[in-house]
Curated annotation (Swiss-Prot):
One of its GO terms (cellular component) is microtubule cytoskeleton. This is Septin-5. GTP binds at residues 51-58, 85, 111, 190-198, 248, 263. Filament-forming cytoskeletal GTPase. May play a role in cytokinesis (Potential). May play a role in platelet secretion. Residues 338-369 form a coiled coil. It comes from Bos taurus. Residues 189-192 are annotated as: G4 motif. Phosphorylated by DYRK1A. InterPro entries: G_SEPTIN_dom, P-loop_NTPase, Septin.
C-alpha cells in the first residue's frame, strides 16, 4: 500500500548533528577504555615446557619469543642427567612490542624423563601447578586483592620424541596427570628428523593414542559464524595440524638469497618459518597471536575453578563438621573490635556467604545433570 509520502535527501544541518549528539550516550567507547587500561597495565603469561632432554625445548622457546632465557645454562653429561632429579626452574623476562608489555615466565623442568626409572617423575610438576593454584586462591581470598600476581601455568608445551612410534608410557602418565590442571599442547620435537610421510603417520598415531587413553589436550575454540572464510580456513588448518611438528634454531643461514633462521644440512636447508618444512609458524600464531587470551581464560574459568570448587567444598565440609562438635573449652568473651576490624570481619563473612551460595549452586547443577 502506497502512503503517498516522498523522502528527499538533504545535507546534515548543525541542528541534525546536535540531535545525533543528544542520542549518543557514549558507552560505545568502552572497548577503547578497556584496551587503554589493559595496555597500560600490561599482560602476563606463564608457559611450561616439558619433555626429556635433547628435544630442543630451550631452542624452541628462544625461536618463539626471540629471547635467550638460558644464557647461564650448564649442559650436563649423560651420567649427570640420569642421576638428576626433576627440578622446577623459572625464567621471567619483560618483553615490549609496539607499546604492549608482556611479562613472560617460562617454567622449565630439567631432569624430567631422563632417569632409568621414570615412575611418578611428573609428581614435582603436578605439585608445582597445585602450589600456584593454592597461592592464587589464598591471595584471592585475602583482604588485599588489587595486586594479585598470577603465577598460574597457562599452557604446557609437551615435547614428544620423534624417534618412537607414538606415545611412550611416560608421555601418557605425564599428560594424564596434568590434563585436568593445565592446557597441554603436544608437540613432535625435531621434526627435521622425519620425512613428511613419517610425520603424517606419527601425527595420526599420536591422535589415536590420545583418544585411546582418554587424554584431554587443549581444545581450540570454535570459530564464530560471522568470521570470514579466510579465518575459518586458517582455523581448520590449525586444528588439523595438531600435534604440531616443530623445529627450532637460533642460527641464521642463507637460503635463496635471503637470510632465514634454519638448519644447514649437506642435503639442503631446513627453514624454521617455512610452513612446508614444519608447523612452527602455526604454533607461534596459535600461542601468541590468536589463542593466548583463550589459554588464560580456560586456565581461569576451567582448571582453576575446578581447584577452587574443590577447596571450597573441603572448607564447607570442615565448617559443617566443626559446627556439629561441642567444644570442651569454654568460650571467653572477646574484646570489642574497632571499626576497621568490624569492617574486615563483615567483608570476610560476606565473602564466605558468597562462597557457600556458589557451592550450593554447583551442587544443584551436579544433581540436575
Amino acid at each position: 500500500m502506497s502512503t503517498g509520502l516522498r523522502y528527499k535527501s538533504k545535507l546534515a544541518t548543525p541542528e541534525d548533528k546536535q540531535d545525533v549528539d543528544k542520542q549518543y550516550v557514549g558507552f560505545a567507547t568502552l572497548p577503547n577504555q578497556v584496551h587503554r587500561k589493559s595496555v597500560k597495565k600490561g599482560f602476563d603469561f606463564t608457559l611450561m615446557v616439558a619433555g626429556e632432554s635433547g628435544l630442543g625445548k630451550s631452542t624452541l622457546v628462544h625461536s618463539l619469543f626471540l629471547t635467550d632465557l638460558y644464557k647461564e645454562r650448564k649442559l650436563l653429561s649423560a651420567e649427570e642427567r640420569i642421576s638428576q632429579t626433576v627440578e622446577i626452574l623459572k625464567h621471567t623476562v619483560d618483553i615490549e612490542e609496539k607499546g604492549v608489555k608482556l611479562k613472560l615466565t617460562i617454567v622449565d623442568t630439567p631432569g624430567f624423563g631422563d632417569a632409568v626409572n621414570n615412575s611418578e617423575c611428573w609428581k614435582p610438576i603436578t605439585d608445582y601447578v597445585d602450589q600456584q593454584f593454592e597461592q592464587y586462591f589464598r591471595d584471592e581470598s585475602g583482604l588485599n586483592r588489587k595486586n594479585i600476581q598470577d603465577n598460574r601455568v597457562h599452557c604446557c608445551l609437551y615435547f614428544i620424541s620423534p624417534f618412537g612410534h607414538g606415545l611412550r608410557p611416560v608421555d601418557v602418565g605425564f599428560m594424564k596427570a596434568l590434563h585436568e590442571k593445565v592446557n597441554i599442547v603436544p608437540l613432535i620435537a625435531k621434526a627435521d628428523c622425519l620425512v613428511p610421510g613419517e610425520i603424517r603417520k606419527l601425527k595420526e598415531r599420536i591422535r589415536e593414542e590420545i583418544d585411546k587413553f582418554g587424554i584431554h589436550v587443549y581444545q581450540f575454540p570454535e570459530c564464530d559464524s560471522d568470521e570470514d572464510e579466510d579465518f575459518k580456513q586458517q582455523d581448520r588448518e590449525l586444528k588439523e595440524s595438531a600435534p604440531f611438528a616443530v623445529i627450532g634454531s637460533n642460527t641464521v643461514v642463507e637460503a635463496k638469497g635471503q637470510r632465514v633462521r634454519g638448519r644447514l644440512y649437506p642435503w639442503g636447508i631446513v627453514e624454521v618459518e617455512n610452513q612446508a618444512h614444519c608447523d612452527f609458524v602455526k604454533l607461534r600464531n596459535m600461542l601468541i597471536r590468536t589463542h593466548m587470551h583463550d589459554l588464560k581464560d580456560v586456565t581461569c574459568d576451567v582448571h582453576y575453578e575446578n581447584y577452587r570448587a574443590h577447596c571450597i567444598q573441603q572448607m564447607t565440609s570442615k565448617l559443617t563438621q566443626d559446627s556439629r562438635m561441642e567444644s570442651p573449652i569454654p568460650i571467653l568473651p572477646l574484646p570489642t573490635p574497632d571499626a576497621e576490624t568490624e569492617k574486615l570481619i563483615r567483608m570476610k563473612d560476606e565473602e564466605l556467604r558468597r562462597m557457600q551460595e556458589m557451592l550450593q549452586k554447583m551442587k544443584q547443577q551436579m544433581q540436575d545433570q
